[in-house]
Amino acid sequence: GEAVIPLLDAVISSAAERKLDEVCIGMPHRGRLNVLANVAGKPHGQIFQEFEGHYQENQVQGSGDVKYHLGTEGVFTAPSGATTKMYLAANPSHLEAVNPVLEGIVRAKQDKLNVKNAYSVMPILLHGDASFAGQGVNMETLQMGQLSGYRTGGTIHVVVNNQVGFTTSPKSSRTSRYSTDIAKMINAPVFHVNGDDPEACVRVARIAFEYRQAFNKDVVIDMICYRRRGHNEGDEPSFTQPQMYRLIDAKRTTRTLYAESLVGRGDISVEENDQISKEFQAELEAIYSAVHNVEPESPNWEIPKTAEANENQTSISADVVAKIAATQVAVPQGFSVHPKLLPQLQKRTEMIKDGTIDWGMGETITYGSLLIEGHPVRIAGQDARRGTFSHRHAVVIDRENGNEWTPLRALVNDESQFFVVDSLLSEYAAMGFEYGYSTIRPEALVIWEGQFGDFANGAQTVIDEFVSSALQKWGERSSIVLALPHGYEGQGPDHSSARIERYLQLCAEQNMTVVQPTTPAQFFHVMRWHIKNPARRPMVYFSPKSLLRLKAATSNIEDFTTGSFQKVIDDPTVVNASRVIFCSGRVYYDLLAEREKLLE
């Protein structure tokens, strides 16, 4: 499969010559060292040092993870001299899990450039044949390709098809004829090419790039090749594929075949071919022998040195609250708001006067205040625009013609500062996308919202492999917020628990923050604290359901204009207490109601 190197070189060279800003790659472990060295330009000495265990102070050591899971970034120079930035995402061993993460990274980079429909950051995803056909996250990621909230202008998919998945033959790993048939669901063109013909691979790569540029849609290259050795260093492949490996053992390498072709055409001599090989081998030997002379690591993969957040003053002025509230009733001329919704929007301006700011308005004040201060806000999830429980209404639909009105966009000059996205019905890829997005935009509040917290386990791979562990494994920081509706309120076992205990078990080494605010003002302060925290880390926020409309669960305007997040809210009405109960969320209001009932 080594022909993937000239294939990638051709794609990225084309991107550089077309003046694309950046090319971002997501790939598994197979061939990664080759890509790191020969495409991404990571120095051979640096790779040897990492395998020998020599690290500079503060350099990411990977927390025991394999060295080739680390990413890198740099500048790619084409043969013509044209250049483009290059980014290779860090990834776990879970095959294909990095795909939606990479798409989120690309979308964030495009949003930062903020040139509409330019798509000048290009994603490339590498796959194995068995995993491309077998892993459902591929279907989810392909489905994102033309959705407005996720579009990245077309991805070039390269399937390194070695015709085996560890020990599993194609007849056991897929029903379809080709491993790439999954791409038919989006009508993506698929180019099948012989991996033993590097020039054909380069030609196909250039065609795929032109297709992506012309149509801004996904395109797939199926590079048919083979795995010369086992799945890993200690594997014996002939146990399970004896006939295949009898053929492979007798087969000359791709390099040998191509060198013979060049010699046969008279492009190089036999002596020149041998000399090239010997010189490169000698160069590697010299670098390896000097491996203790540590080369500087890319600063992107150093453990970020950041101070912990202070108890920041997260309050805002009453004028800012009023300005945000005014957006909720500034209905565009000729816009027809649903008659049941209009009173709810009008009530939001009254709430700030009578001290009954509910959760929906508390959210609105939170997002509006961050927008005013220059922080982009991106909220994505199933039914996120209205809110699962019809409390948010961040985007209002004209009941006559279906036009959209996003009230909070009135606070910013650039509408790309505020995205509220109704996601596809996915957890895995949808959460992965937002995680990737958050790693690139530290200034933004990025929220993935579960329809119910119970459903977040559909994205457990993202939670385990990225959200909770990326900092320790790769030095990668994210400030994603997982908003998970939680509470047993009569809707059955699949609509009751966000499984708080699981996230608490995942907490270690200050890897993430877990919160369950009890009032709208507490939500406001903790989100503003989170976005101002220089020690960026993910947050898991257990959001309410019945509290969204509970009259007791409201806040006064003073709770937003003074103070900060309260770690403990005391009860000033009680003296000489004989028992103290620590609680949060709906439990507090249940206890409060019961106490009031007993006092009657």
Give a label for each model feature.
Residues 1-137, 142-175, 186, 190-191, ...:
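Conserved internal helical-beta-strand scaffold that buttresses enzyme catalytic cores
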Residues 29-31, 225-230, 545-547, 585:
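Glycine-rich beta-alpha junction loops
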Residues 165-176, 184-220, 224-230, 238:
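Conserved phosphate-handling catalytic cores of large alpha/beta enzymes
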Residues 241-248:
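A ubiquitous short alpha-helical element
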Residues 489-492, 549-550, 588-591:
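Short, charged/polar "capping" segments at the starts of alpha-helices
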Residues 536, 547-548, 553-577, 586:
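Conserved catalytic alpha/beta core of Sir2/sirtuin-type deacylases, generalized to analogous enzyme cores
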Residues 576-600:
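Redox- and metal-dependent alpha/beta enzyme cores, enriched for Fe-S-associated oxidoreductases
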